[in-house]
Amino acid sequence: MKYVKSIFAALLFTVVLSIGAFAQSAPKVIAVVNQADWCSVCKGNGQRALGAFMENNKDGEISLVVNDVTDAETKKKSAFELQKLGIIKAMKNYEATGVIYFFDAKTKKPITQITVANSDEEIAYVISKVKRAVR
């Protein structure tokens, strides 16, 4: 059952990434969520937080990338995506799991961060604040 849930979660994240890629070719903000299969905060809050993120990012201004740090293999796959976006160096300072880190897409500088354990309202507030910061 855990394997099925992991497959489902991976599929959901892939769909979210694909939607973000088609919604806007040049996002103003890159959001990176560090997650791992062993992270209890991620397991308990990840799907709810992802739903809150999607609900508040219908315009696609923020591109979401999942940085899966479960093991060496998932880290390698995630590193490829981070490298494509030019934020792999910036992410070296942000390694905590269960956290969404927001970066300016042009400068690659950090804007803010929030844990996936925060409420939907707090996540919505941070997303609106981030969008205003890059306008």
PLM region spans:
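Thiol-based oxidoreductase modules, predominantly thioredoxin-like and allied folds used
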Residues: D59-A79
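Non-catalytic, surface beta->alpha helical segment in thiol-disulfide oxidoreductase systems
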Residues: E95-R135
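Sec/Tat signal peptide C-region and signal peptidase I cleavage site
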Residues: I19-A23
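Positively charged n-region of N-terminal signal peptides that target proteins for export
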Residues: M1-S6
